[in-house]
Amino acid sequence: MDMKKPKNIYIVKYAETGTDGWAYGRPAGIKPSQWPRSRVNGVPMAHIFTVKIPAEYNVRGSDVEYLSVFQSSDFEDDEEEGVNEFLQEGSEALDNNAFWQELVLYRNNMHPREVYQVDEIGGGWCFIYLTEEEVSGKLSELPSKNCLPVDYESMHEINCFSCDQPARYFNLEPHSDDPNVGIKPEEYPDWLEAIEAIDSLKVEDIQGYIPIFHEVSEKLDLNLDKYFNNHHFGGTAHPAQSIPDELSEFYFEFDETLGDPNIGGDGVAQIDLLTNKIHWACG
């Protein structure tokens, strides 16, 4: 996809009167029956955050302006028989009890812009892209608790009921001083090998992405860690381990202080807005 390169990064700044999104809380613009479900056990996922996508990072068109992120963290939970096949493959419901009735209602009313993803350890995530009109409506009501399987138990208790907390609102603050803005992140850029031994480096020698703690950054005093530990769109990545392969420059990076997702206790995650892939690692 031929996209215009962003010229700014955008960092999250919490504010009581923030207008660019919120962590925790409930989503807006979806019905209780549209609340994303785990493909492992059918339980409604936790809402992690909703964020406005800056125009420079909006790869989906002008009608879609917000991204709501949900997590189930169900990688160690017991599988509810038939749920994955029902939701992912269109198979038949296995029962007519309250749990399956709620699951049928969800499948028949799924939000048209819901995207389901599985992370590297098998945990489920959902992204819902929302319009300004949808987000400007009232916050969503929780699904009925009839939607829980009989004898439901979770290893991590990350679902819409256990994680129903007051919202924390925020603004997005633009910055144009990140040298990596608009550049695809790479862990080992080829161009750096040819110049890293040069003592008299100049800013004009920069030919591509520079990892956050690379010695070239120190030689040129680029201050790439200026926004370290900030949730942000684009620019210099701050992964807990290495930069994910094939991560585009159109990404959002966050850690567990944004809505309390389960990403290893000290993890950092990246959502690639071009591919809808989520990556995360912990230290």
Located regions from the model:
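Preference for intrinsically disordered or flexible, low-complexity segments
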Residues: 1-283
